[in-house]
């Protein structure tokens, strides 16, 4: 089963070990990527903590760099992407949600207030659903439902 990271910390530590082994063995990223069946750019990004590797590619990397066996499993996990810390999310998936709120946040606020009155949509009494559906024009679409309880502002 595919596993996902919730923190950059494990992958950052693994990246440090990879860079150390790469230097000790005097290898290039191209040397490490050979035999993985993946592009140099993808493998390099994965080694820097930005992508998961398929099991066969992870095995090649771990064996070539003589990494601990835990690295084999960690290289296959979906990382928290983004290598530049800051206030704005850098993970592409998370950033798209940030972008959506930047573009549609004021619209959502206006429509919530118009339809419900002064208040908020709860993120505590909340349900989230995501479905993958076919796009009639080809490919897939994500249908994301955010179902939060409306909480009116109470004068005091």
Swiss-Prot record:
GO terms for molecular function: cyanate hydratase activity; DNA binding. InterPro entries: Cyanase (IPR008076), Cyanate_lyase_C (IPR003712), Cyanate_lyase_C_sf (IPR036581), CYNS_N (IPR048564), Lambda_DNA-bd_dom_sf (IPR010982). Keywords: Lyase. The keyword Transmembrane helix does not apply. SMART domains: Cyanate_lyase. Its EC number is 4.2.1.104. The active site is at 96, 99, 122. CDD domains: Cyanase_C. It comes from the Bacteria. Pfam families: Cyanate_lyase (PF02560), CYNS_N (PF21291). Signal peptide: none annotated. It catalyses: cyanate + hydrogencarbonate + 3 H(+) = NH4(+) + 2 CO2. Gene3D superfamilies: Cyanate lyase, C-terminal domain, lambda repressor-like DNA-binding domains. GO terms for biological process: cyanate metabolic process. Catalyzes the reaction of cyanate with bicarbonate to produce ammonia and carbon dioxide. Belongs to the cyanase family. NCBIfam families: cynS, PRK02866.1. This is Cyanate hydratase. It comes from Photorhabdus laumondii subsp. laumondii (strain DSM 15139 / CIP 105565 / TT01). The lineage of its organism: Bacteria, Pseudomonadati, Pseudomonadota, Gammaproteobacteria, Enterobacterales. The gene is cynS.
